UniProtKB/Swiss-Prot annotation:
GO cellular component: centrosome; chromosome, centromeric region; cytoplasm; cytosol; M band; nucleus; plasma membrane; protein phosphatase type 2A complex
GO biological process: negative regulation of protein localization to plasma membrane; signal transduction
InterPro entries xref list: ARM-like, ARM-type_fold, PP2A_B56
Organism: Homo sapiens
Protein name per Swiss-Prot or TrEMBL: Serine/threonine-protein phosphatase 2A 56 kDa regulatory subunit alpha isoform
Protein family according to the UniProt entry: Belongs to the phosphatase 2A regulatory subunit B56 family.
Sequence ranges of Basic residues compositional bias: 27-37
GO molecular function, one term: protein phosphatase regulator activity
Its job: The B regulatory subunit might modulate substrate selectivity and catalytic activity, and might also direct the localization of the catalytic enzyme to a particular subcellular compartment.
Length: 486
């Protein structure tokens, strides 16, 4: 049905200029709006005057000859849509449809031989009529998925049952992809993928399962599904920077990647490097980082030669100003190091530990703490020990300086433990680095003293010249005074 909510312009007009300036007032207004939107408007198209539904006989009471025709009649009856924004209209018809949908779900779940070829058309029509619609822009242009409550679909009492029915249909032992492919085609899948932008997380969860089932059963649609997901992500990265269903699509991709045959195709490697790695730059990374990191690690477990370009890609996009994202990147790096091969580790140890050294030195204690936790990982410790000659010189200066200067006592304690571990790995190198570090510090202190001494002399010289100038001016004044007196 058409939305009864006010247009976005009217909503924004309700916020005064002073409220826009005052962030606290603005937030309270947004909170009030959020509460009003807890049940969002149904996005279904208006059908004009509604047809009143009348209950059909129960399927279980019909004879076997009548059941198939009655099944199709019920499917057709459920194509009629209702306005859930009007809580008092069509109550009887809404309840009849809800009960009918429940009955259809149970019917296909508990009976064999009911999904016959002639029923496929009516089944897909009913599903399409109920779930496919144009999703409107968010009611709140300042919507923050991490803070704000999503707009829930008002007609969920019916849509939920349609999704339940769809899943039972796809999972039925009687389901035949060879027949269904006439109706579940590229256009159908494209519309399904567009629904992943729904704000309602309940709907996205159903869509995730439905798309996964379709991918598994329709071999001819697999390449198309991957391509369309690729397009959605590219649009998300480079154009809109907004899509509600990124986490769900990545979750599906995780299992798809897991099933890729070896050797990996060039298109799959390109997807990793051109789509998944650049996705780390997204503002809302926290909403889908766990699923994104899982996909990346799945690729590396499939093909270890991808490790170097992946880590170099992450280092290229390393956050400069967002500590929360740095912590996420460090977590992902640890997941990658958990599956890395020693030969691949040697290729990236220098640039990687230069970045880890910077993170350890971070004034943000969570970033420093997350980087230092690498030394709690037994496998990473073994890799460090094998390559201690390269890694210790990179890390030493930062660690030693932090042990003396960091503001957070927890970080200082962690650094002492790391230094102790590194010293046990190679005591001689550790002592050499300690001596050279102290010597360097002495040289720096000496230079600093020399600089201070030089500035002191310059100040004295400046003062001396100023006094000389002042005396010269005084003497000239005296001479002129004496001359005029004579």
């Amino acid at each position: 049905m058409s939305s009864s909510s006010p247009p976005a312009g009217a909503a924004s007009a309700a916020i005064s200029a002073s409220e826009k300036v005052d962030g606290f007032t603005r937030k309270s207004v947004r909170k009030a709006q959020r509460q009003k939107r807890s049940q969002g408007s149904s996005q279904f198209r208006s059908q004009g005057s509604q047809a009143e539904l009348h209950p059909l006989p129960q399927l279980k009471d019909a004879t076997s000859n009548e059941q198939q025709e009655l099944f199709c009649q019920k499917l057709q009856q459920c194509c009629i849509l209702f306005d859930f924004m009007d809580s008092v209209s069509d109550l009887k018809s809404k309840e009849i449809k809800r009960a009918t949908l429940n009955e259809l779900v149970e019917y296909v779940s508990t009976n064999r031989g009911v999904i016959v070829e002639s029923a496929y058309s009516d089944i897909v029509k009913m599903i399409s009529a109920n779930i496919f619609r144009t999703l409107p822009p968010s009611d709140n242009p300042d919507f923050d998925p991490e803070e704000d409550e999503p707009t829930l679909e008002a007609s969920w009492p019916h849509i939920q049952l349609v999704y339940e029915f769809f899943l039972r249909f796809l999972e039925s032992p009687d389901f035949q992809p060879s027949i269904a492919k006439r109706y579940i085609d590229q256009k159908f899948v494209q519309q399904l993928l567009e629904l992943f932008d729904s704000e309602d997380p309940r709907e996205r969860d159903f869509l995730k399962t439905v798309l996964h089932r379709i991918y598994g059963k329709f071999l001819g649609l697999r390449a198309f599904i991957r391509k369309q997901i690729n397009n959605i992500f590219l649009r998300f990265i480079y154009e809109t920077e907004h899509f509600n269903g990124v986490a769900e699509l990545l979750e599906i991709l995780g299992s798809i990647i897991n099933g890729f045959a070896l050797p990996l195709k060039a298109e799959h490697k390109q997807f990793l490097m051109k789509v998944l790695i650049p996705m780390h730059t997204a503002k809302g990374l926290a909403l889908f980082h766990a699923q994104l990191a899982y996909c990346v690690v799945q690729f590396l477990e499939k093909d270890t030669t991808l490790t170097e370009p992946v880590i170099r890609g992450l280092l290229k996009f390393w956050p400069k100003t967002c500590s929360q994202k740095e912590v996420m990147f460090l977590g992902e790096i640890e997941e990658i190091l958990d599956v890395i091969e020693p030969t691949q580790f040697k290729k990236i140890e220098e640039p990687l530990f230069k970045q880890i050294s910077k993170c350890v030195s971070s004034s943000h204690f969570q970033v420093a703490e997350r980087a230092l936790y690498f030394w709690n990982n037994e496998y990473i410790l073994s890799l460090i020990e094998e390559n201690i000659d390269k890694i210790l010189p990179i890390m030493f200066a930062s660690l030693y300086k932090i042990s003396k200067e960091h503001w957070n006592p927890t970080i200082v304690a962690l650094v002492y433990n790391v230094l102790k571990t590194l010293m046990e790995m190679n005591g001689k190198l550790f002592d050499d680095l300690t001596s050279s570090y102290k010597a360097e510090r002495q040289r720096e202190k000496k230079k600093e003293l020399e600089r201070e001494e030089l500035w002191k002399k310059l100040e004295e010289l400046k003062l001396k010249k100023a006094l000389e100038k002042q005396n010269s001016a005084y003497n000239m004044h005296s001479i002129l005074s004496n001359t005029s007196a004579e």
